[in-house]
């Protein structure tokens, strides 16, 4: 249970976000069956958020803190680190394990 980080492309290995930092990243979220439910890449608009402070799902709050600048990775979030038993109707079903391909573009 939790979040698993699988590196696709390494980052700089030096610059990591800290709790409270604002990060800019691209992501594509998929369900276990491979269907895409959201993508900043498709919108061509990077996602900006404060990380580690509860503004995003727990899987992101913990997973993104493990990424270094420029890193591309899969964040695999179990339901307890995603949307849990409620899901996010109608897009995400209850108790869904989610996969996010993320790229950390900037740490502000």
From Swiss-Prot:
GO terms for molecular function: peptidyl-prolyl cis-trans isomerase activity. It is an enzyme of class 5 (isomerase). Signal peptide: none annotated. Its EC number is 5.2.1.8. Residues 1-20 are annotated as: Disordered. GO terms for cellular component: cytoplasm. Keywords: Cytoplasm, Isomerase, Rotamase. Belongs to the FKBP-type PPIase family. FKBP1 subfamily. This is FK506-binding protein 1. It comes from Rhizopus delemar (strain RA 99-880 / ATCC MYA-4621 / FGSC 9543 / NRRL 43880). The lineage of its organism: Eukaryota, Fungi, Fungi incertae sedis, Mucoromycota, Mucoromycotina.
């Amino acid at each position: 249970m939790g979040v698993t980080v699988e590196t696709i492309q390494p980052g700089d290995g030096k610059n990591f976000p800290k709790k409270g930092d604002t990060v800019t990243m691209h992501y594509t979220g998929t369900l276990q069956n491979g269907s895409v439910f959201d993508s900043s890449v498709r919108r061509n608009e990077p996602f900006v958020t404060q990380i580690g402070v509860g503004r995003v799902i727990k899987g992101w709050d913990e997973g993104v803190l493990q990424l270094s600048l420029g890193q591309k990775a899969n964040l695999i979030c179990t339901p307890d680190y995603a949307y849990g038993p409620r899901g996010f109707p109608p897009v995400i079903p209850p108790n869904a394990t989610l996969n996010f391909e993320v790229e950390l573009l900037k740490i502000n």
